[in-house]
């Protein structure tokens, strides 16, 4: 969990996208914008968390903190998380 800080720092600097596996088109969504993308397995709990996270984004409230909380909760659910980076 040392890399949580690293993820946090990067999420402050860039928008981090939360995607469900089947929504991903890597070429379009990663390379063009050079964003960090967290790809999650498609479970009901993950969907619920994703909706809550996106609600926070819309409200504009403490986004980076919400991202860290979101990822923590996904880990608690033992959700598979893959982090994919766009080309630098």
Located regions from the model:
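Short, charged/polar N-terminal "headpieces" of proteins
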Residues: 1-29
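Intrinsic disorder/low-structure terminal segments
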Residues: 14-16, 37, 69
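Acidic, low-complexity, intrinsically disordered interaction modules
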Residues: 30-52, 58
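C-terminal basic regulatory modules in eukaryotic proteins
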Residues: 49-88
């Amino acid at each position: 969990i040392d890399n949580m800080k690293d993820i946090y720092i990067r999420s402050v600097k860039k928008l981090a996208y939360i995607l469900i596996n089947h929504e991903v088109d890597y070429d379009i969504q990663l390379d063009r914008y050079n964003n960090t993308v967290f790809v999650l397995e498609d479970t009901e709990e993950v969907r619920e968390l994703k909706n809550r996270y996106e609600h926070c984004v819309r409200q504009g409230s403490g986004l980076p903190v919400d991202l860290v909380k979101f990822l923590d909760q996904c880990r608690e659910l033992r959700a598979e998380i893959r982090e994919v980076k766009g080309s630098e």
